[in-house]
Amino acid sequence: MTRTAGAPMGCQRPSRFWGLGCPKIYHEAEDTLVVDPVDNREYFFSHFEPFWANRLFPCFDQPDLKASFSVTVEAPDDWQIISNTLATKTGNGDLSRHEFARSRRFSTYLFALVGGPFAVFEDRRARIPSRLFSTQSMSAYVDAENIFEVTRQGFDFYGKYFGIPYPFGKYDQIFVPHFNAGAMENVAAVVIKEDAYLYRETPLPSRMQKRANTILHEMAHMWFGDIVTMRWWNDLWLNESFATFMSYLAQVEGTPDKHAWQQFSSSMKNWAYWQDQLPTTHPIETRVEDTLSTFDNFDGITYGKGASVLKQLAFYVGSEAFRKGVSSYLKKHAWKNAERKDFTDAIGQAAGMNLDGWTKLWLQKSGINTLVADYDVDAQGRISRFELLQGKGNGDAVLRPHRLQVALFHDREGKPGLEKTVTVNVTGERTAVDDLVGEPAPDFVYPNYGDHAYAKFYLDGNYSPLSA
């Protein structure tokens, strides 16, 4: 229902006016219903990011214009209709009427309307009403027990981490065909690509990990993106980078999967390393001139580097200060819009630090630094000097502050044995690490133990980034 000057204005939109899957690929046909080739059943689903809600109802599609929504849908009686709130269903012959409760305020791109003869799964153990939907032909492949378990774990972790209970009343995850994105964080009605996350065969652990990560990524958006939304598309990178970082953190700290950071390093971080060394590299933070340009820089810098830099920021300020800053940011701007500076200011305030300089070097400058350990050993076989050397690297070629862990290893019958770790704040070209002076000479030095830093690390002590 759209209100003009306070008066409700009803509107109807035949499905042929709707975008199918991703609105950039508009479905030109008499109808935009998805026909399942297995059983010829028909389904529809919306996807309005960044500015396509106006195809369904009159509105201004900008993230800083929030509204509440009240929806009524008439549909075939055997259909499920899903939107952002719970509905009351009443019968009317072959048609049923679905009246959805008025929603909280959120941006139009987060509105969802999905319908069809879906199979429905309900989690009877959940504190928050949770449902899964799939096409009938794929219902046999829905691992509801596992998906619901990850969902419950996510709610428990995020509720405690953010200090804000989940506010939307229900949580639906709808697996649909022909979806051109991996998933979409519509408020309380997450749409997920079925062929990417419903497995016909016994899945490898890596695929289970990926599905759990996607579930937790979209759930993180319920707080960071849906409750608090970017003021303009300039900060879409932060929306996605934060959800990416949080999904891996939630896996490690909120589920039995304690190896998710390794997956992050091999996938997201390596994607960032590759893209950041191309001639086309760009700063994490870029200006979006208009809505049509929203996804122009949607790449490994947006997701991979952005998430890697947030991981570095959490280590730089301390994990608890980071958590408190995030919680403060969400509580202060709940149901409103905010900008990246609001976020980094909240983190800085919680940590007692001014992050303006850090922000300029990490978010507004492109490229990747190089780091290498350089040290001397005396006649007694002990370290007499230890430094970390930083090179400017490519892109904008600037030196950046880093906080990392240096680890010393010794050969133990052909296997590396960890002897000592120290935390180091790297500044400038040379950073002395006096805590390692006097230690027995290592067989191997790893300057990024724990993978907290984002840089190229050279493991050969004969290489000097200062002369590169």
Name each model-derived stretch.
Residues 4-7, 18-125, 138, 145-146:
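Extended, low-hydrophobicity, Ser/Thr/Pro/Gly-biased non-transmembrane segments
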Residues 355-356, 366-447:
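Beta-strand-rich binding/interaction modules
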Residues 1, 52, 100, 131-395:
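Hydrophobic alpha-helical and helix-loop surface patches within well-folded domains
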